[in-house]
Amino acid sequence: MGMRMMFTVFLLVVLATTVVSFTSGRRTFHGRNAAAKASGLVSLTDRRPECCSHPACNVDHPEICR
């Protein structure tokens, strides 16, 4: 095996290890649940018309107040 091929195999192993550890860690720390909560908060903000009159909300979500 050449040096370039060995480097490519090394990168693939590192990438595979990173992907496996990242996805297994998400389940342990309830990453999906946190994403669902964040999505719920964003949709809750979409339903509130008073967000446009609140400066902090208006800055965080300018797409709502167009």
From Swiss-Prot:
Paired cysteines (S-S): C51-C57, C52-C65
Annotated spans, Ser-Xaa-Pro motif, crucial for potent interaction with nAChR: 53-55
Keyword flag Hydrolase: no
Keywords from the named record: Acetylcholine receptor inhibiting toxin, Disulfide bond, Ion channel impairing toxin, Neurotoxin, Postsynaptic neurotoxin, Secreted, Signal, Toxin
GO molecular function: acetylcholine receptor inhibitor activity; ion channel regulator activity; toxin activity
Family per record: Belongs to the conotoxin A superfamily.
Domain writeup: The cysteine framework is I (CC-C-C). Alpha4/7 pattern.
Function: Alpha-conotoxins act on postsynaptic membranes, they bind to the nicotinic acetylcholine receptors (nAChR) and thus inhibit them.
Protein name as annotated: Alpha-conotoxin-like Tx2
Organism of origin: Conus textile (Cloth-of-gold cone)
Upper taxonomic lineage: Eukaryota, Metazoa, Spiralia, Lophotrochozoa, Mollusca
